């Protein structure tokens, strides 16, 4: 049975696999980010969104996996076997949890549509031969205008849409030849 955890979010496991392995942040950094940004939503009783639920499940899976590794490390005497098991877990299950947390945190931060566009454009870039690629890779770095920004100790603040500042008006030189001459000044 082929279960794709990203299908209900309009993405796929294949799209996430186009991203290089070193693209995803360390697992501890992702866990810290998730708990810092969404601790209330993750520990609360209310259902916030499917992304919050997916993050909650990924954190529970990683906790259980960490307990299993700790138990195995305590009960295995061979240092080499212990190292191989930890490396295997980090390279397989750890990577899946990192991908999962990154995807759902990015969807909450940037919006699901933006993340999907990024994954597709990155996938197209990777499949395009190097001589035909545009010079810059797709970047997922700008916050959309509807992003919710939380400040410590305060309620949610919704960011207002960005407005263009008016361009400064040019001042004309006040040199003598440009000053408007009034008829009375000619006398």
From Swiss-Prot:
**Where does this protein have coiled-coil stretches?**
none
Q: Which GO terms describe its cellular component?
A: host cell; host cell cytoplasm; T=4 icosahedral viral capsid
Q: Where are the sequence repeats?
A: 160-164, 167-171, 175-179
Q: Where is this region: Disordered?
A: 151-187
Q: Where is the composition biased (Basic residues)?
A: 151-180
Top-level taxon: Viruses
Keyword match RNA-binding: yes
**Annotated stretches, region: 3 X 5 AA repeats of S-P-R-R-R:** 160-179
Chain's role: Self assembles to form an icosahedral capsid. Most capsids appear to be large particles with an icosahedral symmetry of T=4 and consist of 240 copies of capsid protein, though a fraction forms smaller T=3 particles consisting of 180 capsid proteins. Entering capsids are transported along microtubules to the nucleus. Phosphorylation of the capsid is thought to induce exposure of nuclear localization signal in the C-terminal portion of the capsid protein that allows binding to the nuclear pore complex via the importin (karyopherin-) alpha and beta.
What is the name of the protein in this document?
Capsid protein
Organism, as annotated: Arctic squirrel hepatitis virus (ASHV)
């Amino acid at each position: 049975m082929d279960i794709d955890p990203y299908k209900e979010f309009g993405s796929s496991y294949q799209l996430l696999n186009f991203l290089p392995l070193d693209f995803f942040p360390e697992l501890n950094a992702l866990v810290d980010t998730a708990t810092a940004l969404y601790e209330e939503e993750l520990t609360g009783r209310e259902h916030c969104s499917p992304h919050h639920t997916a993050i909650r499940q990924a954190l529970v899976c990683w906790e259980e996996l960490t307990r299993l590794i700790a138990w195995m490390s305590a009960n295995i005497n061979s240092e080499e076997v212990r190292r191989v098991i930890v490396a295997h877990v980090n390279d397989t299950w750890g990577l899946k949890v990192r991908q999962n947390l990154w995807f759902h945190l990015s969807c909450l931060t940037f919006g699901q549509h933006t993340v999907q566009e990024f994954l597709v454009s990155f996938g197209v870039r990777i499949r395009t031969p190097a001589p035909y690629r545009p010079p810059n890779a797709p970047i997922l770095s700008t916050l959309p205008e509807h992003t919710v920004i939380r400040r410590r100790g305060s309620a949610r603040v919704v960011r207002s849409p960005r407005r263009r500042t008016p361009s400064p008006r040019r001042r004309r030189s006040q040199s003598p030849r440009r000053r408007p001459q009034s008829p009375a000044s000619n006398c």
